[in-house]
C-alpha cells in the first residue's frame, strides 16, 4: 500500500534519479514562480496544507518520509499556495519545531541528500540568527558529504 504522503513526494522530487537528475527535473518547481504551479499545489495538496497548518497529520511524523512531506506542507507549499500573503509563512514555526524533532531522531540522515536540502532550508527561513546558523552548518556538512561530482549542484542551494 502506498504511503499517504507519497504523491506529494513524487510531485516534489519525482519518482527516482540522481540528485542532479532530480534537480534538473524539479528545479523550476522548487525555485520558480509560476501561477500554474501554485494552482497545481493548491488543487492537489491544499487540503493537506490546511490540515498541517492546523496542527494535523502528526501521524506522518512516525517515518522519515512522512516527516519530510509534513515539513514540505508547512514550509514550501504555503509559499506557493499563499504567495504574496502573510499566510505564506504561517507554517514556519511549526516546521522549525518538527525539523528539530526529526533531526533529534536522525530522520534527516535517513533521507536522500537532495531531500535533506529542504529540511535544512526550513532553518534558513527562520528570523532567528542562531536557527539560521544551525541550518547553514547542517547544509555545509551535507555539501561536504557529497561526491565531488555533486558538490557544485549542492553548493547552488
Show the residue positions of the predicted features.
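Intrinsically disordered, low-complexity activation-like regions
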Residues: 1-84, 89-157
Amino acid at each position: 500500500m502506498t504511503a499517504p504522503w507519497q504523491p506529494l513526494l513524487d510531485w516534489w522530487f519525482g519518482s527516482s534519479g540522481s540528485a542532479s537528475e532530480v534537480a534538473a527535473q524539479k528545479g523550476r518547481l522548487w525555485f520558480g514562480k509560476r501561477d500554474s504551479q501554485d494552482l497545481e499545489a493548491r488543487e492537489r495538496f491544499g487540503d493537506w496544507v490546511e490540515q498541517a497548518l492546523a496542527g494535523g497529520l502528526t501521524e506522518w511524523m512516525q517515518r522519515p518520509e512522512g516527516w519530510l512531506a509534513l515539513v514540505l506542507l508547512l514550509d514550501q507549499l504555503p509559499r506557493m499556495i499563499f504567495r504574496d500573503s502573510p499566510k505564506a509563512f504561517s507554517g514556519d514555526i511549526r516546521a522549525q519545531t518538527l525539523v528539530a524533532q526529526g533531526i533529534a531522531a536522525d530522520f534527516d540522515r535517513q533521507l536522500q541528500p537532495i531531500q535533506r536540502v529542504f529540511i535544512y532550508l526550513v532553518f534558513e527561513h527562520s528570523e532567528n540568527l542562531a536557527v539560521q546558523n544551525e541550518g547553514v552548518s547542517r547544509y555545509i556538512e551535507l555539501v561536504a558529504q557529497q561526491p565531488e561530482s555533486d558538490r557544485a549542484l549542492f553548493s547552488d542551494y
